[in-house]
Amino acid sequence: MTHEEILTLLGDYVDYLIANSSAEAPMWNIEKVRSGKPNKWNYIDGCMITACLSLYKTTGDEKYLSFSKDFIDFFVQEDGSIKTYDPKEYNLDNVNQGKNLFTLYDIYGDEKYRRAIDTIRSQLLTQPRTKEGNFWHKDIYPWQVWLDGTYMAQPFYMEYETRYNKMQGCIDSYKQFMNIKKHMRDEKTGLYYHGYDESRQMYWADPVTGCSPNFWLRAMGWFMVAMVDVLERMDEQLYNEYRGIMAQLRQTIEDVHKFQDEETGMFWQVMDHPGAEGNYLETSGTALFAYAVLKGVRLGYLPKRMAAWAEKAFYGTCDRYLSKNPDGSLQLDGICLVAGLGGKDHRDGSLAYYFSEPVVCNDAKGVGPLVLAYTEMIARK
């Protein structure tokens, strides 16, 4: 396919997904589809609605906005409560969808969105923390920091503090990024480990460093986008902190780029084991890299030369994994369904573990980031 054909196909693909989805039955939430349970407020749908709202902002097409509003309105009640969401679950994943409430509030001015924003903020006010001050990833994972959690919570936190709290929590957010750099960055590769256990008690944690053993691509992807999204919401008056996160972002992109597959432009599921048996070129993390870099270049956080790396990742992913079925339906393959640490399935962070998780098509953890990268691509035109 030519680049123009890919961009056209992606536009058709998004339209296909939203035409076949609702808040009760999102086609892109494969975990929900497989479970057979009613849908809940969750980060996976949050990724897709963020992508739809971004498409609206870029194209001006109202269908993306009205779909997003209907989706969110299924959950958000007039009093600001959110159906199926419990702040006291203390799960950072559940904060992710909250970013979209700011957008809807700005467009519609409906106070229920403002109240719902406060509902989600209430979770972060009492979210358990490590001794150094980082949010626990979930209440059920005590003393643990996961890279994923930076994307799930920090952009919402930074936006709330900047808009409504006189920037009081902004330096706290910055410090959480610096703690992650201190504890989770590998000096040799520049990559960050998926998880960190401050208590050093988990079976997956290194007894000295507290880190999990491997570099999972999607976790790195979430982390890169988190830095871009936080900078976008941060006031430049916070001179040192703003530049500190920007420097961290630039260094991370430089380090990650070294692991980009020369032929395809993609990245491997476990980043530093290219070609290992069971390893594969993975869609979601590659798309997150493309989006983080394209957006970072557009907003001036990253040098323009990096855009070529992102375009190679974007088109490489589409060439390899985006296809049209004989019945006219479209699909995006090569998406790792899920990966975590600990829990009842004894997820140990080993290579064998990351290679064993299901690889699926059309899940929003891959679709959402690719569509976000697509919005950046069409904005460049």
Regions found by a protein language model. Give the residues of each.
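CBM-like carbohydrate-recognition segments
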Residues: 2-44, 63-65, 74-92, 96-98, ...
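Long, well-ordered core segments of solenoidal/helical folds
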Residues: 7-26, 66-83, 115-134, 167-203, ...
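Core register positions within helices of long alpha-helical scaffolds
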Residues: 51, 58, 100, 107, ...
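Inter-helical turn/loop segments and adjacent helix faces that build the functional surface
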Residues: 59, 108, 160-171, 230-243, ...
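Acidic/His metal-coordination segments adjacent to aromatic residues that form catalytic metal sites
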Residues: 76-83, 134-139, 199-213, 268-278, ...
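Extracytoplasmic mature domains of secreted/periplasmic and thylakoid-lumen proteins
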Residues: 87, 92-154
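Short, contiguous, pocket-lining structural segments
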Residues: 145-152, 165, 169-172, 207-223, ...
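Oxyanion-binding "anion nests"
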Residues: 224-274, 278
